[in-house]
Curated annotation (Swiss-Prot):
Binds 2 Zn(2+) ions per subunit. This is Putative glutathione-dependent formaldehyde-activating enzyme. Residues 3-134 form the CENP-V/GFA domain. GO terms for molecular function: metal ion binding; S-(hydroxymethyl)glutathione synthase activity. Its cofactor is Zn(2+).
Amino acid sequence: MLLEGSCHCGAVRFRVVSPHPYPFNRCYCSICRKTAGGGGYAINLSGDADTLVVHGAEHTSIYQAEIDGLTSPGERHFCSRCASALWVFDPRWPELVHPFASAIDSDLPRPPERVHLMLENKPDWVEIESREQDRCFAGYPDESIAEWHARLGLEEG
């Protein structure tokens, strides 16, 4: 599926092909929550890094979080004009890019189940909107974004 996204002010527009377009993964870690999660969580999708096309790249900046005193290799791209979170790239998985669902303008499919992860970092004010079929994890689940899509038969060609 072709995902098209943008920042709030329109200075940055991008597109990327994603075989895994379902916005199912709700991350409650402090990094996602504070950089992109207005509801107490952020939703990352998965795309093919080789297909990422960015217009207005001169208006992007990168934030790399510190975790336990070490700089994370994950590069969180955001608009330097309006601060919209756009995507995450991690050189440990150079074939992937993870756009934030909040930056996607394309219609996304509704997931049949959701995964709530990093719940050990969730603040008390955040209420989990969990459905019966949803899965909840204190940390990271063992299943990747691609594996979740494959298990449910939702991979796109």
